[in-house]
A protein has these predicted regions:
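Class I S-adenosyl-L-methionine
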Residues: 20-24, 39-172
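N-terminal Rossmann-like NAD(P) cofactor-binding module of classical short-chain dehydrogenase/reductase
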Residues: 29-31
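Short glycine-/small-residue-rich Rossmann-like dinucleotide-binding loops
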Residues: 35
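S-adenosyl-L-methionine
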Residues: 1-21
Length: 172
């Protein structure tokens, strides 16, 4: 797992670090996604210009640079539902532009809207999960089965002492 702030200027250094870790091996999978603020409906509603011109809207282009360089068999790209409606300055949808760019990199893509609560996470968190496969393939998106959740948040915290606001210990 690598965690970097990605920019055009930082790409060469990031690639150098990845190349050193790979030591000649190929990547099978890249997983990641840009920050959601530029695509989120909440972010757009708070922004005077609706996030138009925000550089974060275009971080998917840097993601594509990783796909071009490493050509993994698959990639997984995650983001908020607002990505489906976020528009570029010319009125085109960022999501459509993104998928077009990934296709130019050699990938067939498909996506689903998944809710984390269906897979054992104790919160409703719907996300777009875009999967790409290198080359032309049909029907490659995995069949993902929901898990039966038998836990509730209250059950997880039932053995902790009750505290009020301002009580407790803050540890560094």
């Amino acid at each position: 797992v690598l965690n970097y702030e990605i920019s055009e200027e930082s790409l060469p250094g990031i690639f150098k670090d990845i190349d050193a870790l790979l030591d000649g091996e190929k990547l099978d999978l890249i997983v990641g996604g840009p920050p959601c603020q530029a695509y989120s409906i909440a972010g757009r509603s708070r922004s005077e210009n609706k996030m138009i011109g925000d550089k974060r809207n275009y971080l998917y282009r840097l993601y594509a640079e990783f796909l071009k360089k490493y050509q993994p068999k698959y990639f997984v790209f995650e983001n908020v539902l607002g990505l489906l409606s976020a528009k570029d300055e010319d009125g085109s949808l960022h999501f459509d532009n993104m998928r077009t760019l990934f296709k130019k990199c050699g990938y067939t893509t498909d996506f689903r809207i998944l809710n984390a609560s269906d897979y054992g996470v104790l919160q409703n968190r719907k996300r777009i999960i875009l999967i790409g496969v290198y080359g032309e393939r049909a029907d490659f998106y995995p069949k993902i089965s929901a898990v039966e959740d038998t836990h509730k948040v209250g059950e997880l915290f039932c053995d902790l002492p009750a505290i009020k606001a301002g009580e407790g210990v803050i540890t560094p």
